Amino acid sequence: MVLIRVLANLLILQLSYAQKSSEPIIGGDECNRNEHRFLALVSSDGNQCGGTLINEEWVLTAAHCEGNKMKIHLGVHSKKVPNKDKQTRVAKEKFFCVSSKNYTFWDKDIMLIRLDRPVSNSEHIAPLSLPSSPPSVGSVCRIMGWGTISPTKVILPDVPHCVNINLLNYSVCRAAYPEYGLPATSRTLCAGILEGGKDTCVGDSGGPLICNGQFQGIASWGSPNCGYVREPALYTKVFDHLDWIQSIIAGNTDATCPFVNF
């Protein structure tokens, strides 16, 4: 049985950060310092994830990134040489689609974090709006994060890396992972490059999938062979969770995602 790669990363103390590489995020390059003002670096219990600031007090990430003593770092580019406007917060409250925090490979891998206090917009910090419409298959999408830059071993970069991939038909992911019996319909998006070589990987969980400028997905899971041919990754579909997100932010903290019988 193929072991599925869950994108959250367990940091090992002996790991050293890569200074330079020709194989970032898997197939990308160092992000422009000004293109990821909304990108959060989420850490807890030695784990690393990404996240997306959606307003001054709320961050979206993946449910499987949940942990104790969560810290959310904003305004980060280089982890070794922090920006002067870097701001760090802790998770005041964490909300899940279901109170038990249950999620599957194809549903409910989403977590909404309320920060202990608001962040201020600055040169390197600004929220990303929620999507106004669902994405279309064929869209060009941007992925980013501080995840491993090697498909064969964990090498964590000092700076985030970015790459463009394509939004694929969900059926492509169903065909790629037959052993998991993915349902015919899902609240997840399938994205990658069929020829391989560009992908999220270990440590990129919870980071954004931005399609045609809109925040459409949250990095969830994929093949252990990051960037492998015809093995794209899956992303929680933000648009399908808008009612839940907006209800929680408005104060209806008992809101749950509607049940869908796949």
Curated annotation (Swiss-Prot):
Its EC number is 3.4.21.-. Residues 19-24 form a propeptide. Its main location: secreted. GO terms for molecular function: serine-type endopeptidase activity; toxin activity. Glycans are attached at residues 102, 169. It is an enzyme of class 3 (hydrolase). One of its GO terms (biological process) is proteolysis. The keyword Calcium does not apply. Expressed by the venom gland. The active site is at 64 (charge relay system), 109 (charge relay system), 205 (charge relay system). InterPro entries: Peptidase_S1_PA, Peptidase_S1_PA_chymotrypsin, Peptidase_S1A, Trypsin_dom, TRYPSIN_HIS, TRYPSIN_SER. Keywords: Disulfide bond, Glycoprotein, Hemostasis impairing toxin, Hydrolase, Protease, Secreted, Serine protease, Signal, Toxin, Zymogen. The keyword Secreted applies. PROSITE patterns: TRYPSIN_DOM, TRYPSIN_HIS, TRYPSIN_SER. Residues 1-18 form the signal peptide. It is found in: Secreted. Residues 25-250 form the Peptidase S1 domain. Disulfide bonds join 31-162, 49-65, 97-257, 141-211, 173-190, 201-226. One of its GO terms (cellular component) is extracellular region. Monomer. Belongs to the peptidase S1 family. Snake venom subfamily. Snake venom serine protease that may act in the hemostasis system of the prey. PANTHER family: KALLIKREIN-1, KALLIKREIN-RELATED. This is Snake venom serine protease catroxase-1. It comes from Crotalus atrox (Western diamondback rattlesnake). The lineage of its organism: Eukaryota, Metazoa, Chordata, Craniata, Vertebrata.
